[in-house]
Design a protein with these regions (language model features):
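STAS-like cytosolic regulatory interaction modules
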Residues: 1-94
Length: 94
């Protein structure tokens, strides 16, 4: 399950995610993000409450990052995932 909370302010919009970014929840997050893009405000994605991100979730977050969304987290493990998505560290061979 994934909880998606949106806080829109004059300067930006924050999407706060809690749970697992997997399966059908990836589609729900994509739908939410596409609606927010229309407003044209910068988007921040708060990943502090995320426990797991599957391959499709990582792909979507990569698309969001490429579209200038800022991925933020204070969690050490999630920071490694964000760095990988943002291309700051190479992805390990699997």
């Amino acid at each position: 399950m994934l909880r998606i909370s949106v806080i829109a302010r004059a300067e930006d919009t924050t999407i706060t995610l809690e749970g697992r970014v997997v399966g059908p929840w990836v589609d729900e997050l994509r739908h939410c993000w596409q609606q927010l893009r229309v407003a044209g405000r910068p988007v921040r994605v708060d990943l502090d409450g995320v426990a797991f991100i599957d391959a499709r979730g990582r792909e979507l977050l990569g698309e969001m990052h490429a579209d200038r969304a800022v991925l933020v987290t204070g969690d050490v493990m999630m920071r490694a995932v964000v760095d990988e998505i943002a291309g700051r560290v190479p992805r390990p061979d699997r």
